[in-house]
């Protein structure tokens, strides 16, 4: 979009890139400002692509926070890591991405209650406080 960020990869591909799963997705999910519907499926080459509308407009400033929260919402479903190993991986990602809990808080209300449960169980909510 004229050199501006308008989306990000989501779900299994992002979990795989973070090293949280060894699964290689057969389909790719993209969250994009360009999505015209809440959910659309298409194909590119031999890959199935799912395009979703973002919860809020995606920008260069917020895409990492939104991508991280999307992942965290489903971390209990897709992650092959748990406990301290998972916590360390999530904390490391937050450090590398320059994310603080304060960067994420304004987006919490756009996510289901399950996010709050995962924030506590992974201890991400305590990053920088008790870590």
Please give the residue ranges for each predicted region.
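Short beta-edge/loop segments at beta->alpha junctions of small alpha/beta modules
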Residues: 1-2
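Hydrophobic alpha-helical interaction segments
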Residues: 52-131
